[in-house]
Each structure stands twice: as structure tokens, then as C-alpha cells.
């Protein structure tokens, strides 16, 4: 069964308050999202597999721990998820980065993939899906389904804020995927926005309406 981890570090909560503030402009918003993503990445990657290696320091030979295997793939959900990638790669520079773009057909309500580029060895990597907001959970759920179809086995979802409705949607569909958030917010409003939330993350990141 998946678990939900709220990373309530003082620095994360401070920066999240600035992100929520409607008076925070796009430049500061982008920088803050990257910073929070980097801080969250420390906890999200806590259980990555390690191997023992022997190295030689200027003094002597010794045994140390290093990451094992193919390491990490970061997969943002376009477009808002892109805002979290810089913070992640600053901490994990060797990570591969994939991209997933989805929209919902207005008639069938089924997800339509309009863009998908993933590392060829996605099945061998620990995959971290990024999206600043987990609202209804539809996009995240569909992106994770697509990743599994492409061979991904070890997936975790990382969001800044999440509504309980979105968390339930993802957990019901993907009980094997752990969810990491900076805040579990109150609810969704009638327009499907997270309350109190942070507005439209994509628009605030890129200065669009």
C-alpha cells in the first residue's frame, strides 16, 4: 500500500508560504519552486539503493557507500512539473529527465498523450514524477499509468501541495506509488483548484494567463 509523506521542514514551509502569496512574481515563484523541490528531494530519495565501494583517500584506502544501479529518472508532467526539475537536478546531476504531456478528451474524458520522451532504460531507474499541484489527481494518475506501460517499475510522486481528493485518486489507482508533498491542503473548490493552494502553477511559473 502506498504511503503519503508530508515533508514539513521549516525551510520548506517558509518558502511554500512565499509561493502561495499572490504577490510573488514569476521570477521569485520559479526560484522558490526550484528551491523547495531541491529540499524535498533529500527526503524523496532517502531510500535509494546503495553499494559498497573501495576508494583511496590521500591517507589510505577505505570503503564507502555510493548509489547503486541506474539511479534516478525525473519525469515532470508538462508544463508545470518542469518548474521542479532544476532543483532536482542540482541535487542529482546524473539523473535522466523524461517528459510527459497529457490532456483529456472533452467527449470521452479519456487521457490523450501528446508528448512522451523517456530514458530507454526507464525500467531500471527509480522514477520521480513531479507536478507542483495534485488537485483532482487525474493527470498524475494517467501519467503514472503511462509510465508503467513504458516499463517503469519503481515510481514515486512528488508535489508541492495536494488536495485529499487527488491523493485518494492516485492511491486508489496506484497503491504501489508513494506520494511526497510539502502540504496536504484542505479541499478542491468547485473549479477544481486546490484550497488554499497556490493558484495555477503553470501560469505563475511562466507569466501566462
UniProtKB/Swiss-Prot annotation:
Q: Which UniProt keywords apply?
A: Allosteric enzyme, Glycosyltransferase, GTP-binding, Magnesium, Nucleotide-binding, Transferase
Task: Using the UniProt record, name the top-level EC class of this enzyme in a single word.
Answer: transferase
Write the protein's name: Uracil phosphoribosyltransferase
A Pfam short name: UPRTase
Q: In which pathway does it act?
A: Pyrimidine metabolism; UMP biosynthesis via salvage pathway; UMP from uracil: step 1/1
- To which protein family does this belong? Belongs to the UPRTase family.
| Endpoints of the signal sequence | none
Cofactor note, please? Binds 1 Mg(2+) ion per subunit. The magnesium is bound as Mg-PRPP.
Q: Which Gene3D superfamilies match?
A: 3.40.50.2020
For this protein, the activity regulation entry reads:
Allosterically activated by GTP.
InterPro entries of this UniProt entry?
A: PRibTrfase_dom, PRTase-like, Upp_B, UPRTase/APRTase, Ura_phspho_trans
One MF term in the entry's GO annotations: uracil phosphoribosyltransferase activity
Q: Describe the function of this protein.
A: Catalyzes the conversion of uracil and 5-phospho-alpha-D-ribose 1-diphosphate (PRPP) to UMP and diphosphate.
Task: Give the source species.
Answer: Clostridium botulinum (strain Hall / ATCC 3502 / NCTC 13319 / Type A)
Instruction: Provide the reaction this enzyme catalyses.
Output: UMP + diphosphate = 5-phospho-alpha-D-ribose 1-diphosphate + uracil
Keyword ATP-binding appears in the UniProt entry: no
Q: Which domain of life is it from?
A: Bacteria
The entry marks the following residues as binding 5-phospho-alpha-D-ribose 1-diphosphate, namely 79, 104, 131-139, 200
Give me the residues that bind uracil, please: 194, 199-201
Among SUPFAM superfamilies, the record links this protein to: PRTase-like
Amino acid at each position: 500500500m502506498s504511503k503519503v509523506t508530508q515533508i514539513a521542514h521549516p525551510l520548506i514551509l517558509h518558502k511554500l508560504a512565499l509561493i502561495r502569496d499572490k504577490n510573488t512574481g514569476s521570477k521569485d515563484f520559479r526560484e522558490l519552486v526550484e528551491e523547495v523541490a531541491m529540499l524535498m528531494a533529500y527526503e524523496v530519495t532517502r531510500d535509494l539503493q546503495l553499494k559498497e565501494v573501495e576508494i583511496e583517500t590521500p591517507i589510505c584506502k577505505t570503503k564507502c557507500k555510493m548509489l547503486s544501479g541506474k539511479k534516478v529518472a525525473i519525469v515532470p508532467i508538462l508544463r508545470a512539473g518542469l518548474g521542479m526539475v532544476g532543483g532536482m537536478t542540482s541535487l542529482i546531476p546524473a539523473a535522466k529527465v523524461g517528459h510527459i504531456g497529457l490532456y483529456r478528451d472533452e467527449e470521452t474524458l479519456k487521457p490523450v498523450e501528446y508528448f512522451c520522451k523517456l530514458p530507454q532504460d526507464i525500467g531500471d531507474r527509480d522514477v520521480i514524477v513531479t507536478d507542483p499541484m495534485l488537485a483532482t489527481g487525474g493527470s498524475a494518475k494517467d501519467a503514472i499509468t503511462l509510465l508503467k506501460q513504458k516499463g517503469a517499475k519503481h515510481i514515486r510522486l512528488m508535489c508541492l501541495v495536494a488536495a485529499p481528493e487527488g491523493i485518494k485518486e492516485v492511491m486508489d489507482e496506484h497503491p504501489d506509488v508513494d506520494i511526497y508533498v510539502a502540504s496536504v491542503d484542505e479541499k478542491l473548490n468547485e473549479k477544481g483548484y486546490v484550497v488554499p493552494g497556490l493558484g495555477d502553477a503553470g501560469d505563475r511559473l511562466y507569466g501566462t494567463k
